[in-house]
């Protein structure tokens, strides 16, 4: 049994991982939230604690906790420091309370070039280095799955909790937008189901966590992502190629801009945010920041990660047969 605290667990990724931890049937889990506890009965072994994320209160809550998993998210606004401050308080409290392990709110890319909304992740990486510079006071790891393979079934769900997000690759419409000349940049694709299962194993891992916890369902070039789409969808894609200088300047000369549907973005801001976010993602793909390492593939050589082609072939076969949600089990 591991005593785990989860911060920001009401989000999509957090809920997927909580489900995997609960499925183990042996962990004690405390969910930290600014909100009141839901009316629904929580699963066995799970309790809800309302907090302002004040350090003194967190210290009391975290006493006896072995591992803190953070999924803190918020507005895609580089001037908003709430996410950064919340995680710094979590880190400070974890150290004071004697917590052994901490996983900050990562859950995506290896780097953050061109994606200003991830600046807080970089700041927290630096803060963790700072607090451990004289001696190790808190073991931590950066869980990085790359892009969820599930997003390539958009707009059809292929996971219990994850809300589908539009990418520049739209398998449903057989359409892609890319940055010209960067077709060979690599992207790591990993299912959210694999991520959840690996985290559920990682909290029980007796050896020290690696500093970076990359996991890898498959590395595909941008060209290969499109070719795979053409294969599983049974037809050619329309591919729009944009000039890098235009994309960097925020000018998207394309007929289609992916919708900004992430829950952290207020509905009234989504139309304005969409081209900004798409430009950042396009440049992020092109610069290779979504190609992540494979530490957990190597630590767990017997674990069979779901290959993108296998997942997407089964998923799109169901969708093409009339399914509105993918019942695929991986």
Question: Which residue stretches match the model-derived regions?
Answer:
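Oxidoreductase cofactor-interface core, primarily capturing Rossmann-like NAD(P)-dependent enzymes
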Residues: 2-42, 55, 97, 110-236
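Short, amphipathic alpha-helical "lid/cap" segments that border enzyme active or binding sites
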Residues: 91, 192-200, 305-313
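Terminal hydrophobic/aromatic helix or amphipathic segment near a protein terminus
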Residues: 213, 226-289
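NAD(P)H-binding glycine-rich loop region in Rossmannoid oxidoreductase-like domains
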Residues: 31, 36-97, 109-111
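Amphipathic terminal alpha-helices
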Residues: 293-330
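Short, glycine-/small-residue-enriched flexible loop/hinge segments at domain edges that mediate gating
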Residues: 102-110
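Structural motif
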Residues: 3, 66-67, 101
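A conserved mid-domain beta-alpha-beta active-site/ligand-binding segment of alpha/beta enzyme cores
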Residues: 185-196, 273-286, 301
């Amino acid at each position: 049994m591991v005593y785990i605290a989860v911060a920001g667990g009401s989000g999509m990724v957090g809920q997927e991982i909580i489900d995997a931890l609960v499925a183990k049937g042996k962990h004690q889990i405390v969910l930290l939230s600014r909100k009141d506890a839901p009316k629904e009965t929580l699963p066995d072994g799970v309790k809800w604690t309302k907090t302002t994320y004040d350090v003194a209160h967190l210290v009391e809550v975290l006493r006896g906790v072995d591992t803190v998993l953070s999924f803190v998210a918020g507005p895609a606004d580089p001037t908003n420091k709430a996410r950064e401050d919340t995680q710094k308080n979590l880190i400070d409290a974890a150290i004071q309370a004697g917590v052994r392990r901490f996983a900050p709110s990562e859950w995506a890319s290896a780097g953050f070039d061109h994606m200003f909304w991830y600046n807080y992740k970089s700041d927290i990486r630096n803060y963790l280095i700072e607090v451990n510079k004289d001696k190790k006071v808190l073991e931590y790891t950066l869980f990085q799955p790359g892009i969820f393979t599930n997003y390539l079934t958009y707009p059809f769900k292929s996971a219990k909790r994850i809300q589908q997000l539009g990418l520049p690759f739209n398998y449903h419409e057989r359409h892609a937008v890319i940055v010209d000349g960067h077709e060979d940049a690599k992207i790591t694709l990993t299912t959210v189901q694999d991520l959840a299962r690996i985290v559920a194993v990682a909290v029980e891992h007796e050896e020290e966590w690696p500093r970076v916890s990359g996991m890898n369902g498959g590395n595909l070039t941008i060209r290969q992502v499109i070719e795979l789409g053409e294969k599983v969808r049974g037809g050619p894609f329309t591919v729009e190629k944009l000039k890098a200088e235009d994309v960097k300047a925020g000018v998207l000369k394309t007929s289609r801009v992916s919708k900004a549907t992430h829950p952290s973005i207020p509905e009234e801001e989504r139309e304005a945010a969409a081209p900004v976010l798409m430009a950042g993602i396009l440049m992020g793909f092109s610069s290779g920041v979504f190609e992540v390492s494979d530490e957990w593939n190597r630590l767990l050589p017997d674990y069979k990660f779901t290959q993108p082609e296998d997942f997407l072939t089964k998923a799109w076969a169901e969708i093409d047969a009339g399914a509105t949600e993918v019942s695929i089990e991986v």
